[in-house]
Amino acid sequence: MALLVEKTSSGREYKVKDMSQADFGRLEIELAEVEMPGLMSCRAEFGPSQPFKGAKITGSLHMTIQTAVLIETLTALGAEVRWCSCNIFSTQEHAAAAIARDSAAVFAWKGETLQEYWWCTERALDWGPDGGPDLIVDDGGDATLLIHEGVKAEEEYKKNGALPDPSSTDNAEFQIVLTIIRDGLKSDPTKYTRMKERLVGVSEETTTGVKRLYQMQANGTLLFPAINVNDSVTKSKFDNLYGCRHSLPDGLMRATDVMIAGKVAVVAGYGDVGKGCAAALKQAGARVIVTEIDPICALQATMEGLQVLTLEDVVSEADIFVTTTGNKDIIMVDHMRKMKNNAIVCNIGHFDNEIDMLGLETYPGVKRITIKPQTDRWVFPDTNSGIIVLAEGRLMNLGCATGHPSFVMSCSFTNQVIAQLELWNERKTGKYEKKVYVLPKHLDEKVAALHLGKLGAKLTKLTKDQADYISVPIEGPYKPAHYRY
């Protein structure tokens, strides 16, 4: 692939779309900093001691304005950083330009092809002769996946000379991954093994990536320690819930200008993300129907006044369909053929396999009409009616809008900084094995406390008698690890 890495005047590598947007990006970063008190508190608390001095951090996470504040927090604490996005549509060009010019090596632009996406991931992991990063900030697990698949291929190559065969899988994206690994083996047959040996650990941002980590842990194939940031309360109950409540309608309205009030909306899945999406649609005046496999989540939905049905029950009646499950094959092409004309179909789960885009793209005679970037109308020849698909079935809130607002991302990203610090500071103690860990409750509470002042909140203080009565320390943590918020 004929992509060339560029360099700034100071010699920092990058590949972004438009460096002329760097000044614009810097202005928005400065606005976001005011809305991200957790990250700014990390800079104030840890910046003087430079705890990341000597650390090389690779990030694979949406290259947005909010992520820019995270990156510059890591560099303010002493780290060197290389970054790529974890989604082909989520990069904000001005954010990428500002960071590439001022702070870190960035390889990201909006509208990457899948080949370009994995090239960017490979570049973000490439630290030259040193072998790779010390730490990874991951979102969805693609950087982690590339290293694991690379190590597996190198072991096979060393054992019997076998190269990865891209034709061994029907998954077009995984074919690209295997091609990258195969081509790299010829010139450097131990690249990913050296990365594995150097790596201290990874902190994972989202549900889908965490699922991958737990699968590898169960299989005994996890190569380095991992911290599950997603299941911190101040991430999952805020980013996943309140963030989606904000960004779903933002993406819908930017993409389609549709009036949500009066529409019938189907939300597939009623976890934290689904709860936020359903609340947003209900508050906007839609009649919301939930599909669920879990009786507990289904019961929660009914207690919120929502109807719980199957997709087959409502596929021909609804106006808006949103997938939030983190699973695959939720809305198939046969479902889409039965939808009413101009029904809107979108996904807010991490990957693009909740909606059967391959089935849609290969349906005989189907016609794709691009209305604007990331908004396409697909017309079926046998019905002459069409559906509107947002962001090609990928994350619509980042593909069609700018994702979650700065404040809620400050909660998530403060967890990321704390997780990275924890891994780095304990790198020589043996505290973290090749397992998946969750941050302790007192750190979760610390993240929350850092954000209260911005909102004008003031905590009540326990007396010693009160603390003794409920058997908690006066300064916390206030809830047991198993408590459900």
Swiss-Prot record:
Pfam families in the record: AdoHcyase, AdoHcyase_NAD
GO BP term, example: S-adenosylmethionine cycle
Residues binding substrate: T64, D139, E205, K235, D239
Cofactor: NAD(+)
Catalytic reaction equation(s): S-adenosyl-L-homocysteine + H2O = L-homocysteine + adenosine
Entry binding sites for NAD(+): 206-208, 240, 269-274, 292, 327, 348-350, 397
SS bonds (residue pairs): none
Triggers of expression: By stress.
Cofactor note: Binds 1 NAD(+) per subunit.
SUPFAM superfamilies in alphabetical order: Formate/glycerate dehydrogenase catalytic domain-like, NAD(P)-binding Rossmann-fold domains
Protein's pathway: Amino-acid biosynthesis; L-homocysteine biosynthesis; L-homocysteine from S-adenosyl-L-homocysteine: step 1/1
EC code: 3.13.2.1
Molecular-function annotations in GO: adenosylhomocysteinase activity
Family membership noted in the UniProt record: Belongs to the adenosylhomocysteinase family.
Subunit structure: Homotetramer.
UniProt function note: Adenosylhomocysteine is a competitive inhibitor of S-adenosyl-L-methionine-dependent methyl transferase reactions; therefore adenosylhomocysteinase may play a key role in the control of methylations via regulation of the intracellular concentration of adenosylhomocysteine.
Protein name according to UniProt: Adenosylhomocysteinase
